[in-house]
């Protein structure tokens, strides 16, 4: 579930302080596979915590213990 507030996405993969693929500060380089869309996010953008990630044939979901869950299907509708 992704919470939408005033047109902005508030979820573990929304723009935040941390890189969702490395867990480092957001201004660090993103791995090539992640840039190509081949990797799901592994870290919460809001707090940098490691997320529980489940990859399925049709996408993925990721859950932060503090900021909730997001599903790739939910993100596809916002593109």
UniProtKB/Swiss-Prot annotation:
Q: What happens when the gene is disrupted?
A: The deletion mutant is unable to grow without extrabacterial biotin. The growth defect of the deletion mutant in biotin-free media can be complemented with biotin but not with another intermediate of the biotin synthesis pathway.
Species of origin reads Mycobacterium tuberculosis (strain ATCC 25618 / H37Rv)
Lineage of the native species?
Answer: Bacteria, Bacillati, Actinomycetota, Actinomycetes, Mycobacteriales
Q: What does this protein do?
A: Required for the activity of the biotin synthase BioB.
The entry's family comment says: Belongs to the BsaP family.
First and last residue of the signal peptide: none
Does the keyword Transcription feature in the UniProt annotation? no
According to the UniProt entry, its GO molecular function terms are:
iron-sulfur cluster binding; metal ion binding
Keyword field: Biotin biosynthesis, Iron, Iron-sulfur, Metal-binding
| Protein name per Swiss-Prot or TrEMBL | Biotin synthase auxiliary protein
For biological process, the GO terms are: biotin biosynthetic process; symbiont-mediated perturbation of host innate immune response
Cofactor binding note from Swiss-Prot or TrEMBL: Probably contains an unusual Fe-S cluster.
For activity, the cofactor(s) needed are:
iron-sulfur cluster
């Amino acid at each position: 579930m992704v919470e939408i507030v005033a047109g902005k996405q508030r979820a573990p993969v929304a723009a935040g302080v941390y890189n969702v693929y490395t867990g480092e500060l957001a201004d660090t380089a993103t791995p090539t596979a992640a840039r190509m869309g081949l990797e799901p996010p592994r870290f919460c953008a809001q707090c940098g915590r490691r997320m529980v990630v489940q990859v399925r044939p049709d996408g993925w979901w990721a859950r932060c213990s503090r900021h909730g869950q997001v599903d790739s299907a939910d993100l596809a509708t916002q593109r």
